[in-house]
């Protein structure tokens, strides 16, 4: 039924569903829509964005048994769900200073609690100022739970044994504790007195449908009550955001758009952001799915319409959309005099996200404005510097920029690519490119790379140092008396390696460790407590320069000691620390500044 303009007071809220992989967000949406979306998706994971409208009469019908607990008379037309594979597509629901989404459902496996992607989603929701509630999914997996298909949670919980209720409460309070650590007050929804200060937790089972009625009733009631000003219907020209750019058979290049304000009509002039500049074009066709039908499953059921009111998920066909930018704002231009204002507004928004500086930082490329913004934000939280952040495939310029950085800061001389490829024919010149299609995973890959490079550099530097060591020539274990001397020794403290120079207790150099052996097997090192045979090369003879029972030290250069103490303090063992103090006493006889100011 079409609602007349005079009857329109509130638009439908835009609801985004987020959650960790396999926590059940697609299954939950499937249950809400009453379709079999999951079964039509390869690998049971959402492959592309969709938008589904759930009309008010469906919500009221489902929530009928809850009217005593959640009394609602709906004035909103329904709920518009954005089906998102993780927060990658939610990122494109961007709006200056916030998000197009009015409210979010964070789906959490109640048996596992908050996972990495859940926490990352919460951080983005907080940044975009989007209120959310928790769908604590998979209650059917609770030991002893008796499933009751498609009934409200409050009805189902009454049918459970006391020990099962206690078990559920413990799982809920585990979530409450995790959310408290992130700075949020939360509680099971039926125990909340003030929803403005407390995140609601709704126990559900996407598999059996238990709790879905509670979830929908709460969503509709909360948005209608607390977001009324935001939901007020506006009659003016449409404002929206591009979710995805596609090439559709028979339609050419199209854009999937969420209209969050105003009215969009066929033949309207629209202005939007493109990869290489502003695009101004005319709407050739508007297509919408039927209620309870997912946009991405309705390629053959798309209905062409002449106009659409906010909020709605629509497909727009128009000329010159090949370079349209996902995540860009889109505006209807009724008056040519406003073109320049909209153009400037869009350009400023894009400029805020695209970055370039001459610092040593990583090169970041993404497929859309929204994902680029989310990645930049996540990297800034991690303290990872960014030299260049841009949209589109990896170009020769990106490789050159990464090469410049690699010469000075090897750990940052990389290109991180989110859903973009390398342009053909470009030589990467040995520059590492990290690809990933999950935001939090790409961030983890970047962190791992930086850490691996630093650790390798640390090992290289550390391995070139002459480390403190103290040995004793064992009496009765002289195998060769002259150059090279071969003797049995015990390592009293620290470490010795081949090529380490040795000094006596009076500071005189006696030679260099040539080889270390244990039972005729060559060793790279010997540490405290080990008894091994070593050969010493140099002008040395047992009985003349050194004697059985003598104590020798490694001759640690001043610079090596400073690097060891300042850069690698965690590598200094207790026995090595004592050896350092003894070496400092010996070396200061010749150099009073040796080891001065070091915190041993």
Swiss-Prot record:
Keywords: GTP-binding, Initiation factor, Nucleotide-binding, Protein biosynthesis. Gene3D superfamilies: P-loop containing nucleotide triphosphate hydrolases, Translation factors, Translation initiation factor IF- 2, domain 3. Residues 137-140 are annotated as: G4. Residues 19-26 are annotated as: G1. Residues 83-86 are annotated as: G3. CDD domains: aeIF5B_II, IF2_aeIF5B_IV, IF2_eIF5B. Belongs to the TRAFAC class translation factor GTPase superfamily. Classic translation factor GTPase family. IF-2 subfamily. This is Probable translation initiation factor IF-2. It comes from Saccharolobus solfataricus (strain ATCC 35092 / DSM 1617 / JCM 11322 / P2). The lineage of its organism: Archaea, Thermoproteota, Thermoprotei, Sulfolobales, Sulfolobaceae. The gene is infB.
